[in-house]
Amino acid sequence: MSTCQQVARPLVRCLRQTGPGAATCSTRSVAVAAVRPFSSTPMRKEEGATTTTTTSPVDSTTTPPPLPSATEAKATVADTVVGGPELGSRRRRAALATTGNLPFEQLPYQCFQDARKILQQDRAAKIAQIVKETEKIKLIEARDASEFEGGEAAKQTRIKSLRKYIEELKILADINDPEVKRRFEDGRGDMTKPVYRFMAERRWRSMDYKIIAQRISQFHVVPDLLPAFDPTMDVKLSFRGYQVSPGAILDSRVTEVAPTLRMQVFDKGERLLTVVVIDSDVPDVTHDNFKRRCHFLAANIPWDPSKTVLSLRSVGDRVEGDVGKPWLPPFAQKGSPYHRLNVFVLEQKPGAKIDGEALKKHLENRENFSLKGFREKFDLEPVGFNLFRSEWDEGTAEVMERHGIPGAEVEFKRQKFASLKPPRKARGWEAKRQKPKYKSLWKYVKRIA
């Protein structure tokens, strides 16, 4: 028998089956694919309808389960893509698709279950070590500072070192747990726990941090605004619900409304933040230079790892904080180069609250704002950054008129300077033949005035 006949014979058999209870090839293949590995029992959803157990999944006497209807399949896909919790890795979703309604931690894979046992043993060892280190801290706290060689400073340094080691053990205890990874991939991680903060920071530094660091160097934020700066928190920018990539040029009608910041800190505890938005490219015609303008400033904003969204429009109203300068829409006059709008997040010293009246007094004028001087006066530490750019567009004049900003009719042009070189004598074949003796050739020669 030829190879073609061997391949075609099963297809012909499938086509000849015309009975109402006969299974087609496609249905039988689905039934074979739906069989759970490492088990000969039916799936949970089929236990009510199935009364016998079959050892061979391809037995011709067994009627395969019916295919789901188009409506059910469409609902399942929509559940997964739009609102369902299964947003993690494709490998995990593929494993869940072949195991029915089993819980994630009970997947019937021998290797998976053996790995979970090893991870549980390792976690128990880490927890025992955490208890041991906690007892050490209690003993050190009970001792007098005079017993340490460096006094109270050495005692606090030792306690701080042990607490840092305990935080590392907490991360190592759960970093490989499949359930922890699943929650983090699905966006349901508890940021009050160190393991989720560690995973979030690792993901941020893998790409988003590199992009922000590149923009800081590419747009010369350092040293134009600060002598040195390395961000340590994630800050994302969105206008009217749409996230903006760092450094994007936005329409002035979009930036007319104050943005929303998605901020994520990676260390525990509550702190007070200050948000500053600066235009670092305001033309200064008098001095033929550029100056800076403050477009927004708010201080004393409480923040912790569990918070993620800050609407600048809500500061001082629904969100606690003191507004030094409300939002001023970014604008650029016609002919000027693009303006860099820098969004800085600065952390205040623990327990140090900025006086609102002193803040407003320091910012009586938006122009000539110095971030370096503001930072030194109020003892702030820059921790987060993002930026966008603004140019003159068809809606800039309307935005400036609505908010009472003068200068919409101003247009910047490059100033032309007369050359300081003396006039150059004409040279070339035509220049030599401008004399009267070449008058017969003038009709062929270009006249040079």
UniProtKB/Swiss-Prot annotation:
The keyword Cell division does not apply. One of its GO terms (cellular component) is mitochondrion. CDD domains: PEBP_euk. InterPro entries: PEBP, PEBP-like_sf, PEBP_euk. Residues 50-62 have a biased composition (Low complexity). Transmembrane segments: none annotated. Residues 37-72 are annotated as: Disordered. The keyword Transmembrane does not apply. Keywords: Mitochondrion. It comes from the Eukaryota. It is found in: Mitochondrion. Belongs to the phosphatidylethanolamine-binding protein family. Mitochondrion-specific ribosomal protein mL38 subfamily. Component of the mitochondrial large ribosomal subunit (mt-LSU). Mature N.crassa 74S mitochondrial ribosomes consist of a small (37S) and a large (54S) subunit. The 37S small subunit contains a 16S ribosomal RNA (16S mt-rRNA) and 32 different proteins. The 54S large subunit contains a 23S rRNA (23S mt-rRNA) and 42 different proteins. PANTHER family: PHOSPHATIDYLETHANOLAMINE-BINDING PROTEIN, PHOSPHATIDYLETHANOLAMINE-BINDING PROTEIN 4. Component of the mitochondrial ribosome (mitoribosome), a dedicated translation machinery responsible for the synthesis of mitochondrial genome-encoded proteins, including at least some of the essential transmembrane subunits of the mitochondrial respiratory chain. The mitoribosomes are attached to the mitochondrial inner membrane and translation products are cotranslationally integrated into the membrane. This is Large ribosomal subunit protein mL38. It comes from Neurospora crassa (strain ATCC 24698 / 74-OR23-1A / CBS 708.71 / DSM 1257 / FGSC 987).
